[in-house]
UniProtKB/Swiss-Prot annotation:
Keyword Signal: yes
Signal as UniProt keyword: yes
Organism placement in taxonomy: Eukaryota, Viridiplantae, Streptophyta, Embryophyta, Tracheophyta
Subcellular localization: Secreted
Keyword terms of this UniProt record: Antimicrobial, Disulfide bond, Fungicide, Plant defense, Secreted, Signal
Disulphide bond pairs: C31-C78, C41-C60, C46-C72, C50-C74
Family membership: Belongs to the DEFL family.
Span of the signal peptide: 1-27
GO terms under cellular component: extracellular region
GO BP terms in the entry: defense response to fungus; killing of cells of another organism
InterPro entries linked: DEFL
Protein name: Putative defensin-like protein 165
Amino acid sequence: MSTKLFSYFMLLVVLFSVLTIIPKTEAQKRCRQELEPGKQCVLAKCRELCFKQLKGFGSCIEKPPGSSKYTCNCFYNCGPPGFF
């Protein structure tokens, strides 16, 4: 009986500690910046440039939509700094 009671108590403590931490966490904001506007995007170069400049992930996106022209867009973390 006492082992079962102790197990329930520990479960309650863990649950309570998780619930108190959850409101303190903040999702990091993601931003997008167009790199080399007007130039045709080459994916390998775009990813390298984005990582070097903003520590982000580069992607070629159609601009304007429906055309055959692509521009380099860099997606990176721009929100408040994390704890890690």
